[in-house]
Amino acid sequence: MNEASKLFMADFDRRPYVPGDARLVVSPENARERLGRFIRGARKQLLIYDPRVSDDAMLRLIAERIKAGVDVRIMGQVEGKWNVKSERHPGKRLHIRAIIRDGKRAFLGSQSLRRLELDKRREIGVIITDEIVVREMLDVFEKDWAKTDSGKKRAKKAAKAERKEEKLAAAS
C-alpha cells in the first residue's frame, strides 16, 4: 500500500516515479517486463481474464507457453492472427484483468495485454502471492470457465470418461 501511495503522490505532483516493490506492476514503467516475466514463468497453467489481448509480444509469449504444453485458457478476446483460442466471458461484460499462474501466483490490475495499456497509459496492478487469495481467484475462474462452450465440452468429456471407468470397474 505504501508503494501505491508513493506512485499516487508522484503522479499528483507530476514527478517521475521509480517502482520500488517487485510485486507492483506499473504502466508504462515496468508492466511489459514484469508481466512478460510472469507469463514466461508458467509451467503448468495460465488462466487469463482480459477483455482484449492484442499485444504481439505478449501473444508470442502466450503461444510459446502453449507450445511448451502449458494449459492456457483465456476468457476474453484475442487478436485472430495468433490463432490462440479464447472464450467469451459467460456474464454480461468482462472488465477484470487477471492472470493466474500455476495456481500459486496471480496478477490483478487494470492493464490489458494491449500495447496502449502496457506502454502508454498509467495503469497499475499487483502480483499476488497469498495462497488463499490465489485459490479463490482460481475457483472463480474455473466456475466461469465451466459456463463457456469449452468448459461444457470439457465437463462432458470428463463425465464420459468417468462412466467408462465405472463400466470397466463393474465388469471386473
Predicted ranges, named:
Residues 35:
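Acidic, amphipathic alpha-helical patches
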Residues 1-32, 41-172:
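PLD/PLD-like phosphodiesterase catalytic module centered on the HKD motif
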